C-alpha cells in the first residue's frame, strides 16, 4: 500500500516568521526523528493506527516502541505511567481531537509527542 504523505506546499507570508529561532524541518517524519534524537527517548508508545513510515525514525534511532489501541473516537484506550526516557505519541486525527490532546498534555507533559 502506498502511504499518503504529510508534506504540504510551502506557504509564504509577508513579515517575519512567527518563531524566528525555530528549527525548520520538511516532514513530520523528520520532526519525529529530531525529537527522538534531541530527547534521547528509549521507548515510545505509538497508536496502531499510524502510518508505517513513522516507524522508520524509531528503527533508525534504535528506539523501542509499543503499540496502543484507540477507541471509535480516536482516543487512547489505555494510560501509561512513563519512565523519564519514554514518550507517548498521539495523532490528532484530522485536527478534531483538541480536548483529547489537552487531557494527554496534562497527563504526560513534555513527554507527549
Q: Each predicted region: which residue ranges?
A:
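Conserved PLP-binding active-site segment in aminotransferase class I/II-type PLP enzymes
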Residues: 1-41, 82-84
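A short beta-strand submotif of the Rossmann-like class I SAM-dependent methyltransferase core
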Residues: 24, 46, 90
Amino acid at each position: 500500500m502506498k502511504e499518503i504523505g504529510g508534506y504540504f506546499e510551502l506557504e509564504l507570508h509577508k513579515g517575519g516568521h512567527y518563531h524566528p529561532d525555530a528549527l525548520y524541518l520538511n516532514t513530520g517524519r523528520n520532526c519525529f526523528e529530531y525529537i527522538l534524537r534531541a530527547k534521547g527517548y528509549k521507548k515510545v508508545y505509538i497508536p496502531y493506527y499510524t502510518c508505517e513510515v513513522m516507524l522508520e525514525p524509531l528503527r533508525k534511532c534504535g528506539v523501542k516502541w509499543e503499540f496502543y489501541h484507540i477507541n471509535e473516537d480516536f482516543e487512547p484506550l489505555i494510560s501509561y505511567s512513563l519512565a523519564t526516557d519514554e514518550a507517548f505519541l498521539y495523532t490528532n486525527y484530522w485536527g478534531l481531537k483538541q480536548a483529547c490532546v489537552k487531557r494527554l498534555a496534562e497527563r504526560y507533559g513534555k513527554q507527549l509527542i
